Amino acid sequence: MASAANSSREQLRKFLNKECLWVLSDASTPQMKVYTATTAVSAVYVPQIAGPPKTYMNVTLIVLKPKKKPTYVTVYINGTLATVARPEVLFTKAVQGPHSLTLMYFGVFSDAVGEAVPVEIRGNPVVTCTDLTTAHVFTTSTAVKTVEELQDITPSEIIPLGRGGAWYAEGALYMFFVNMDMLMCCPNMPTFPSLTHFINLLTRCDNGECVTCYGAGAHVNILRGWTEDDSPGTSGTCPCLLPCTALNNDYVPITGHRALLGLMFKPEDAPFVVGLRFNPPKMHPDMSRVLQGVLANGKEVPCTAQPWTLLRFSDLYSRAMLYNCQVLKRQVLHSY
């Protein structure tokens, strides 16, 4: 029994280290620090939680430092006590930038013998900016312009995400974005101008509860530090989104937002594109390798690559996008 308990606690420690980004709570005091983290349902760590299943994992962390004793932590997940333990080390680092996030590393847990177990005191996350914007992405990402910049990545480590222009490789998220100069020329651009978002707007169905088109019940926003019970769990920006018509088909019809086609095809082709056809999802800095347009007569026309740049996300935002989504976790974070 002790061995099983230790194994479960070690899994919890790894979950806290590998699937959580933290936000300080206003319940904190000089004697007690309280943090919260919200993350999509884990594909690895499955705790015993009271009550019905949730589509999110809300974590409350209470850090106490008794006089003349080492620090100990109390962890609640979705309101259920997960552990009271003394970490061998506890490193914290505030993330510079607009999101009020804190990185943490928990060393090996041991029993916190004789310590009081505080009740869950959540308070409210102290947050400033709760959205990942285009400006955040552009100022922290690296443009990938040549095949040579990708040649050091082991091919087997490249994981395609969705069907249109997103990959995860060796700890980083790669996505196509509209070039900055095009954004300045097009003020009505979608707020998150990734190729995956364009494809989603162009081809999604009209059922807002569709999991594949809208991500219903599969997403959180880690930047908020907490997910409410009534959250629909949808996303407009996650690269997991793909039209439900593409689940078993390389061809998908255009269903709306036709004005976006002007940034994907030549002016003489864009008005007549009625569908998209996806190519095999090999990562390449040329957007035209991802898909092509299909005209009413069945003819295929190439995409225009010039308005698009492949971006390698920063470690922080790669983690944020990954932790937001059950689907991405199952694809990328299925063991540790």
Curated annotation (Swiss-Prot):
Transmembrane intervals: none
Keywords assigned: G1/S host cell cycle checkpoint dysregulation by virus, Host cytoplasm, Host Golgi apparatus, Host nucleus, Host-virus interaction, Inhibition of host innate immune response by virus, Inhibition of host interferon signaling pathway by virus, Inhibition of host STAT1 by virus, Inhibition of host STAT2 by virus, Inhibition of host TYK2 by virus, Interferon antiviral system evasion, Late protein, Modulation of host cell cycle by virus, Viral immunoevasion, Virion, Virion tegument
Keyword Acyltransferase listed: no
Domain of life the protein comes from: Viruses
Gene Ontology terms: cellular component: host cell Golgi apparatus; host cell nucleus; viral tegument
Annotated GO biological process: symbiont-mediated perturbation of host cell cycle G1/S transition checkpoint; symbiont-mediated suppression of host JAK-STAT cascade via inhibition of host TYK2 activity; symbiont-mediated suppression of host JAK-STAT cascade via inhibition of STAT1 activity; symbiont-mediated suppression of host JAK-STAT cascade via inhibition of STAT2 activity; symbiont-mediated suppression of host type I interferon-mediated signaling pathway
Interaction with host BBLF1 as annotated region, ranges: 67-69
Location (main, coarse): virion
Induction annotation: Expressed in the late phase of the viral replicative cycle.
Localization: Virion tegument; Host cytoplasm; Host nucleus; Host Golgi apparatus, Host trans-Golgi network
Family according to the record: Belongs to the herpesviridae cytoplasmic envelopment protein 2 family.
Job description of the protein: Plays a critical role in cytoplasmic virus egress. Participates in the final step of tegumentation and envelope acquisition within the host cytoplasm by directly interacting with the capsid. Upon virion binding to target cell, a signaling cascade is triggered to disrupt the interaction with the capsid, thereby preparing capsid uncoating. Activates the AP-1 pathway and enhances EBV reactivation and virus release.
Description of how the protein assembles with itself and partners: Homodimer. Interacts with BBLF1. Interacts with the capsid. Interacts with BKRF4 (via C-terminus); this interaction is important for infectious virion production. Interacts with host TYK2; this interaction participates to the inhibition of host type I IFN signaling. Interacts with host STAT1; this interaction leads to STAT1 dephosphorylation and inhibition. Interacts with host STAT2; this interaction leads to STAT2 degradation. Interacts with host CUL1; this interaction might facilitate CUL1 recruitment to STAT2, leading to ubiquitination and degradation of the latter.
Protein name according to UniProt: Cytoplasmic envelopment protein 2
UniProt lineage: Viruses, Duplodnaviria, Heunggongvirae, Peploviricota, Herviviricetes
